[in-house]
């Protein structure tokens, strides 16, 4: 039975036998697409709960036999239950994970590493989101394992409020990031003040 659980194996290169070369992730998806909802197309009008965050995010995928996004989606569908970080930051973490894995990975031994370093504009609904000035340092490994396959997902996200101007992006609702956000049950609602943005409810 396939189960999601916290660390059961470590993603190390020191294996007793040399694994088969990892195959490249599928390239039939868009490579790097910006967030479709959380960075506005135009100037945000409702500035009350808007905050710029300087983000460093890394998602490292360890799999001796290669992996597919089907497996990653399977892992992330249980993200709500295994997330060990600050609950007030979970929406931000979900956005960063989706964006990172929408990018092009860099091979690192038997791992594939996705990184993102951006200034992102986030807007939370009233009473949601981090406290003013709150920072996040989050690190976790989630694994999926059965008799035939092993995939380890190492996630690291650091976020702090900053005053650097966030960039304006285009919306693409068909991005891989949107698919992963749906898998992680990202909770949002459209802003009443700005049709180009959605509010994070978590």
From Swiss-Prot:
Matching entries from InterPro entries are given as: Rhabdo_M, Rhabdovirus_M_sf
Membrane disposition = Peripheral membrane protein
* Residue positions of motif PPXY motif: 35-38
The UniProt keyword set, sorted, is: Host membrane, Host-virus interaction, Membrane, Phosphoprotein, Viral budding, Viral budding via the host ESCRT complexes, Viral envelope protein, Viral matrix protein, Viral release from host cell, Virion
Localization of this protein: Virion membrane; Host endomembrane system
Q: Where is this region: Essential for glycoprotein binding?
A: 115-151
Residue ranges of the TM segments: none
Phosphoprotein listed as a keyword = yes
Q: Which domain of life is it from?
A: Viruses
GO molecular function annotation: structural constituent of virion
Q: Name one GO cellular component term.
A: membrane
Pfam families (UniProt xref): Rhabdo_M2 (PF04785)
Q: Which GO terms describe its biological process?
A: viral budding via host ESCRT complex
The misc remark on file is: Most abundant protein in the virion.
> Would you identify the family this protein belongs to, as annotated?
Belongs to the lyssavirus matrix protein family.
Self-association or partners: how does it assemble? Homomultimer. Interacts with nucleoprotein and with the cytoplasmic domain of glycoprotein.
Domain comment in the entry? Late-budding domains (L domains) are short sequence motifs essential for viral particle budding. They recruit proteins of the host ESCRT machinery (Endosomal Sorting Complex Required for Transport) or ESCRT-associated proteins. Matrix protein contains one L domain: a PPXY motif which potentially interacts with the WW domain 3 of NEDD4 E3 ubiquitin ligase (Potential).
Task performed by this protein:
Plays a major role in assembly and budding of virion. Completely covers the ribonucleoprotein coil and keep it in condensed bullet-shaped form. Inhibits viral transcription and stimulates replication. Plays a major role in early induction of TRAIL-mediated apoptosis in infected neurons.
Q: What is this protein called?
A: Matrix protein
User: Which species does this protein come from?
Assistant: Irkut virus
């Amino acid at each position: 039975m396939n189960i999601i659980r916290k660390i059961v194996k470590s993603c190390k290169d020191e294996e007793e036998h040399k694994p088969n070369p990892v195959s490249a992730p599928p390239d039939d998806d868009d490579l790097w697409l910006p967030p479709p909802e959380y960075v506005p197309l135009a100037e945000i009008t409702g500035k009350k709960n808007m905050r710029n965050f300087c983000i460093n995010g890394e998602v490292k995928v360890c799999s001796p036999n290669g992996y597919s996004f089907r497996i990653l989606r399977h892992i992330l569908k249980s993200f709500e239950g295994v997330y060990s970080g600050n609950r007030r930051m979970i929406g931000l973490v979900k956005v960063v994970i989706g964006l990172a894995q929408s990018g092009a990975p860099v091979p690192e031994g038997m791992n594939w590493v996705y990184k993102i370093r951006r200034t992102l504009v986030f807007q939370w609904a009233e009473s949601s989101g981090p406290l003013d000035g709150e920072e996040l340092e989050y690190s976790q490994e989630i694994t999926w394992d059965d008799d035939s396959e092993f995939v380890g997902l190492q996630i690291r996200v650091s976020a702090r409020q900053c005053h650097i101007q966030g960039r304006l992006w285009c919306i693409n609702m068909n991005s891989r990031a949107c698919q992963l956000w749906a898998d992680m049950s990202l909770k949002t609602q459209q802003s009443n003040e700005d049709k180009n943005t959605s509010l994070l409810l978590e």
